[in-house]
Curated annotation (Swiss-Prot):
GO molecular function terms listed in the Swiss-Prot or TrEMBL record: amyloid-beta binding; protein-folding chaperone binding; unfolded protein binding
InterPro entries in UniProt: PFD_beta-like, Prefoldin
Pfam families in the record: Prefoldin_2 (PF01920)
Any single GO CC term annotated in Swiss-Prot or TrEMBL for this entry: protein folding chaperone complex
Function in brief: Binds specifically to cytosolic chaperonin (c-CPN) and transfers target proteins to it. Binds to nascent polypeptide chain and promotes folding in an environment in which there are many competing pathways for nonnative proteins.
Protein name: Prefoldin subunit 6
Gene assigned in the entry: PFDN6
Assembly notes: Heterohexamer of two PFD-alpha type and four PFD-beta type subunits. Component of the PAQosome complex which is responsible for the biogenesis of several protein complexes and which consists of R2TP complex members RUVBL1, RUVBL2, RPAP3 and PIH1D1, URI complex members PFDN2, PFDN6, PDRG1, UXT and URI1 as well as ASDURF, POLR2E and DNAAF10/WDR92.
UniProt keyword annotation of Ligase present: no
Glycyl lysine isopeptide (Lys-Gly) (interchain with G-Cter in SUMO2), cross-linked positions: 66
Keywords for this protein: Acetylation, Chaperone, Isopeptide bond, Ubl conjugation
Modification N-acetylalanine occurs at: 2
Length: 129
């Protein structure tokens, strides 16, 4: 009985560890998006200071290419929308993973209690193996 519970417990621990890895990966991805959001907001603020007489360039590979100011503003705006949507998606994913992780933690606690009871019953019944 205890061996069966121990195997089940080990499987649940592995599931929990995988959830923690996924959670960590999602947090890391969200942090990268936050950094991109900050950078793009700075670019948006800088572009807002410019008028039509200013020349704007964008980097394409190793080459700087002239770009219309309106086009640059639109591109940055679209990028900000995309990044914001991705952050929301990551937040939803993080909530789901945290909920699953909490459920897994509860399952582990129950299995540990069962295992301890089985061990105690085994120790309390000499002659039985």
């Amino acid at each position: 009985m205890a061996e069966l519970i121990q195997k089940k417990l080990q499987g649940e621990v592995e599931k929990y560890q995988q959830l923690q890895k996924d959670l960590s990966k999602s947090m890391s991805g969200r942090q990268k998006l936050e950094a991109q959001l900050t950078e793009n907001n700075i670019v948006k603020e800088e572009l807002a200071l410019l008028d039509g007489s200013n020349v704007v360039f964008k980097l394409l590979g190793p080459v700087l290419v002239k770009q219309e100011l309106g086009e640059a503003r639109a591109t940055v705006g679209k990028r900000l929308d995309y990044i914001t949507a991705e952050i929301k998606r990551y937040e939803s994913q993080l909530r789901d993973l945290e909920r699953q992780s909490e459920q897994q933690r509860e399952t582990l606690a129950q299995l540990q209690q069962e295992f301890q009871r089985a061990q105690a019953a085994k120790a309390g019944a000499p002659g039985k193996a």
